[in-house]
């Protein structure tokens, strides 16, 4: 390929990493056994290739710059990154990674950590300047990725907010600053394990030291003797430069004209401001983006990259501003969030296109292929469980009989409990289902009553909030067949309808009604009553038309033979003693159209199935009155830490995982967190409906349909203690002697958060500023509820460092207790004022149904 280095030819075809080291103007491929070993005197290019479930390959290009790298190598790396982008069809996202300031995405490729090696790598693979020391000291930060920096072996390198690892000849010490989080301490243990296995061949002692703990601890004495004895650690100093960058709300947009930056004057950023024949720089403080139009030349892109580096250098922000390079059509979520409106991408439906190509190949080879079987859905629950359905009515519930539990009304709300046995354990899956026309009073009651019903069962319970029209496949699997009628039976809904004198469309046994029939093959079938009009038809589906005592079964021209079989089965359910008239699309009799109120236009395009979405994991927490979410890249089971609440985002549904020590005490609190997450708009296509399905999974109760997203180790599921204690027990090979934590969601049947209608929000972000800043966002209503830290805790008169908002342990406010062990306090997601009321509810007698 012209203008592309030969080293890039044929790369990116397989998932994984490809790494090259810059040697002058040449690229030296790094073998896989050496991946993760970076030298401070070199610059590297890293290609990450991931195959999405849609079959599309996603490419991310990073060029890593060591702190001692040559300037000419940095320029070569940026040019080669452009060449690699061209070789891959100009659909990559490029990141400039500076040693010590790497992105979480980059660090996630090299778990447990990367520890840059002093010196450089020559073209003959000889190491220069590799310094071997008897004792080395590392500073560790980060909760889901470890940021490891070698620091001088000195007492002055210690502080209260980080975790430090001191590696000696015979023992590895881990020192936890009193303001470090429990997650950071646990992640630092991964670094300790890495050093033990790679530098000591697995043979060395491990000692953990707590900041301020001296009395009766021989390991602490040995640790401080390394520094010549104990001395107080100075108070932490806040990084004012980074704070200013993070708090600034101003954004600057420039278009690049022959390496000159021309400001674009605007108050709000809109997608229409970006022209395809230009390149732009968007400065957002902590991140600086280069957006390249799809019609720009390669030479223009190289000039723009140079302009970007000049801009960051002139601003003096090489070390604290991350550069991201994008091509039009391949923008990241972080970039889109800075714009007021960003249109939804028109993505080719490769999933269905591939199926059609396979069918064409078989037909060409002489096979009679009328239909390629669809992929059978993956079922992770037993289909032999027991089902119970309750109607929510006037603040209470009524158990439906077996004959009625497969008939729901769209004006009502229901609680569904599906109980089944899995791996010898009892599981209970609760759904709070809200009909499309149900009223807010019943919706709120359904969520509250379901929360109280959890206490009535033994075993593992998972709850879900589901809305009509957005049900997951899991919901329909628990029903053998399901019919959803128009109308309602609850008193609140009937009163609402009577006040409006609007009962048109309610299902009448001998009336006229139209049902759309769908189903999961061989598993379940459903019929949903739709508006009685020809416009409700769709060529991709089959329908049952009830016209008094007569029935029509209508076959859409794009429906499949399996759809026709489902239609016959539903006729036996809906009207078992009636004969129906089979009608194919295009040959309808006049009385068919008369029953529908006349002919009209309807959708005749094939409904294309979206490919399965790739899941993304986010950690959520409150910080200084703000609710924030941050993506966890290359996630695993170990990222489900007990002190946190995490959201597994599968686009069509959310799985809200609640750790025992997260501080979330009720189902309603967890649901509110899910609503805030949906309102933030961090998904690729922006904000999603508030009625997206949300599962609440409590630590220890994980069902198989959740664990299937992980390489699950069930022995870890039963471990006790905080995340640091659990990982330390594994590392030392000792058995735990800890009490079983109380499962808070089983104890609370109400929430102290204000309840909202599922279709409304008390505070929805509408500006880019509210949606931006590294996937962090705020909820104004929740911010008012959060109580800020006491000014006394931040008093400058105190010599001990004050706990950070993310601290799990705090130093005493008394100078006399400087040398005492700081008490470990689990960070609570919600502030104490909210917990007090939630705990008061938890101590009351649970509602029995």
Curated annotation (Swiss-Prot):
<keyword id="KW-0963">Cytoplasm</keyword>
<dbReference type="GO" id="GO:0051014">
    <property type="term" value="P:actin filament severing"/>
</dbReference>
<keyword id="KW-0117">Actin capping</keyword>
<keyword id="KW-0106">Calcium</keyword>
<feature type="region of interest" description="Disordered">
    <location>
        <begin position="739"/>
        <end position="849"/>
    </location>
</feature>
<keyword id="KW-0206">Cytoskeleton</keyword>
<feature type="repeat" description="Gelsolin-like 4">
    <location>
        <begin position="405"/>
        <end position="475"/>
    </location>
</feature>
<feature type="repeat" description="Gelsolin-like 2">
    <location>
        <begin position="147"/>
        <end position="213"/>
    </location>
</feature>
<feature type="compositionally biased region" description="Low complexity">
    <location>
        <begin position="791"/>
        <end position="823"/>
    </location>
</feature>
<keyword id="KW-0009">Actin-binding</keyword>
<dbReference type="InterPro" id="IPR029006">
    <property type="entry name" value="ADF-H/Gelsolin-like_dom_sf"/>
</dbReference>
<feature type="compositionally biased region" description="Low complexity">
    <location>
        <begin position="747"/>
        <end position="782"/>
    </location>
</feature>
<dbReference type="InterPro" id="IPR007123">
    <property type="entry name" value="Gelsolin-like_dom"/>
</dbReference>
<keyword id="KW-0677">Repeat</keyword>
<dbReference type="InterPro" id="IPR007122">
    <property type="entry name" value="Villin/Gelsolin"/>
</dbReference>
<dbReference type="GO" id="GO:0032432">
    <property type="term" value="C:actin filament bundle"/>
</dbReference>
<dbReference type="Pfam" id="PF00626">
    <property type="entry name" value="Gelsolin"/>
</dbReference>
<feature type="repeat" description="Gelsolin-like 5">
    <location>
        <begin position="527"/>
        <end position="566"/>
    </location>
</feature>
<feature type="repeat" description="Gelsolin-like 1">
    <location>
        <begin position="30"/>
        <end position="107"/>
    </location>
</feature>
<dbReference type="GO" id="GO:0051015">
    <property type="term" value="F:actin filament binding"/>
</dbReference>
<protein>
    <recommendedName>
        <fullName>Villin-1</fullName>
    </recommendedName>
</protein>
<dbReference type="GO" id="GO:0007015">
    <property type="term" value="P:actin filament organization"/>
</dbReference>
<dbReference type="GO" id="GO:0051693">
    <property type="term" value="P:actin filament capping"/>
</dbReference>
<comment type="function">
    <text>Ca(2+)-independent actin-binding protein. Binds actin microfilaments (MFs). Involved in actin filament bundling, severing and capping. Caps the barbed end of actin filaments and protects them from disassembly. Promotes VLN3-mediated MF severing.</text>
</comment>
<comment type="similarity">
    <text>Belongs to the villin/gelsolin family.</text>
</comment>
<dbReference type="GO" id="GO:0005737">
    <property type="term" value="C:cytoplasm"/>
</dbReference>
<feature type="repeat" description="Gelsolin-like 3">
    <location>
        <begin position="262"/>
        <end position="335"/>
    </location>
</feature>
């Amino acid at each position: 390929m012209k203008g592309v280095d030969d080293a890039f030819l044929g790369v990116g075809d397989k998932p994984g990493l490809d790494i090259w080291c810059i040697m002058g103007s040449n690229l030296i491929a790094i073998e896989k056994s050496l991946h993760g070993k970076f030298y401070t005197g070199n610059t590297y290019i890293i290609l990450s290739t991931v195959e999405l479930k849609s079959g599309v390959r996603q490419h991310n290009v990073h060029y890593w710059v060591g702190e001692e790298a040559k300037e000419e190598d940095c320029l070569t790396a940026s040019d080669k990154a452009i060449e690699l982008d061209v070789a891959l069809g100009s659909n990559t996202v490029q990141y400039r990674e500076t040693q010590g300031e790497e992105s979480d995405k980059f660090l996630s490729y090299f778990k447990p950590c990367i520890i840059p090696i002093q010196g450089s790598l020559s073209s003959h693979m000889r190491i220069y300047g590799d310094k071997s020391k008897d004792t080395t000291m590392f500073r560790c930060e980060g909760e889901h990725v470890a940021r490891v920096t070698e620091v001088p072996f000195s007492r002055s390198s210690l502080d209260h907010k980080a975790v430090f690892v001191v590696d000696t000849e015979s023992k590895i010490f881990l020192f936890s600053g009193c303001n470090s989080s429990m997650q950071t301490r646990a992640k630092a243990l991964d670094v300790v394990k890495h050093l033990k296995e790679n530098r000591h061949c697995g043979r060395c002692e491990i000692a953990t030291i707590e900041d301020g703990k001296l009395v009766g601890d021989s390991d602490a004495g040995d640790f401080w003797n390394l520094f010549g004895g104990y001395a107080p650690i100075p108070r932490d100093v806040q990084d004012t430069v980074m704070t200013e960058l993070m708090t600034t709300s101003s954004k600057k947009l420039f278009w690049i004209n022959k390496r000159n930056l021309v400001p674009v004057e605007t108050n709000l950023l809109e997608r229409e401001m970006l022209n395809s024949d230009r390149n732009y720089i968007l400065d957002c403080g902590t991140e600086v983006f280069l957006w390249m139009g799809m019609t720009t030349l390669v030479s223009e892109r190289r000039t723009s990259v140079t302009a970007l580096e000049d801009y960051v250098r002139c601003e003096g922000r090489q070390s604290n501003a991350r550069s991201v390079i994008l091509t039009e059509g391949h923008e990241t979520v972080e970039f889109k969030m800075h714009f007021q409106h960003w249109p939804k991408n028109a993505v080719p439906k490769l999933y269905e296109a591939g199926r059609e190509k396979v069918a064409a190949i078989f037909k060409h080879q002489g096979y009679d292929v009328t239909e390629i079987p669809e992929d059978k859905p993956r079922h992770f629950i037993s289909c032999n469980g027991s089902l119970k359905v309750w109607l929510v009515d006037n603040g209470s519930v009524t158990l439906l009989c077996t004959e009625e539990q497969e008939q729901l009304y769209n004006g009502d709300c229901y609680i569904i409990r599906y109980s089944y046995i899995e791996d010898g354990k009892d599981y209970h899956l609760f759904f709070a289902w809200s009909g499309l026309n149900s009223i807010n009073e019943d919706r709120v009651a359904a969520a509250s009553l379901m929360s109280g019903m959890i206490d009535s069962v033994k075993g593992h319970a998972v709850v879900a909030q589901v809305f009509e029209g957005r049900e997951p496949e899991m919901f329909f699997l628990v029903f053998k067949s399901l019919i959803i009628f128009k109308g309602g039976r609850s008193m609140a809904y009937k009163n609402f309808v009577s006040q409006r004198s609007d009962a048109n469309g309610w299902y009448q046994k001998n009336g006229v009604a139209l049902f759309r029939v769908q189903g999961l093959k061989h598993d379940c079938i459903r019929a949903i009553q739709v508006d009685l009009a020809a416009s409700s038809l769709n060529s991709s589906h089959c329908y049952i038309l009830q016209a008094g005592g007569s029935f029509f079964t209508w076959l859409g021209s794009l429906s499949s033979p399996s759809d026709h079989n489902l239609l016959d089965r539903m006729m036996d359910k809906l009207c078992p003693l009636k004969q129906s008239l089979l009608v194919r699309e295009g040959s309808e009799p006049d009385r068919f159209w008369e029953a529908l109120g006349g002919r009209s236009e309807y959708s005749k395009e094939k409904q294309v199935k979206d490919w399965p979405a790739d899941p993304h994991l986010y950690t959520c927490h409150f910080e200084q009155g703000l609710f924030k979410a941050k993506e966890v890249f290359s996630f695993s089971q170990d990222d489900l830490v007990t002190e946190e609440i995490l959201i597994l985002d599968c686009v069509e549904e959310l799985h809200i995982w609640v750790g025992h020590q997260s501080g979330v005490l009720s189902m309603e609190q967890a649901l509110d967190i899910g609503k805030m997450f949906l309102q933030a708009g961090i998904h690729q296509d922006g904000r999603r409906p508030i009625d997206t399905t949300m599962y609440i999974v409590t630590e220890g109760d994980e069902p198989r349909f959740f664990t299937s997203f992980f390489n699950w180790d069930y022995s870890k599921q039963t471990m006790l203690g905080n995340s640091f204690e659990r990982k330390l027990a594994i590392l030392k090979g000792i058995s735990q002697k800890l009490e079983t934590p109380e499962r808070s969601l089983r104890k609370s049947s109400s929430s102290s958060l204000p309840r909202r209608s599922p279709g409304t929000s008390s505070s929805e972000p509408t500006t880019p500023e509210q949606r931006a800043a590294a996937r962090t966002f705020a909820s104004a209503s929740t911010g008012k509820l959060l109580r800020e830290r006491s000014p006394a805790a931040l008093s400058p008169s105190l010599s001990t460092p004050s706990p950070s908002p993310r601290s799990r342990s705090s130093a005493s406010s008394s100078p006399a207790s400087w040398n005492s062990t700081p008490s470990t306090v689990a960070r609570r997601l919600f502030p104490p004022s909210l917990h007090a009321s939630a705990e008061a509810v938890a101590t009351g007698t649970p509602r029995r149904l």
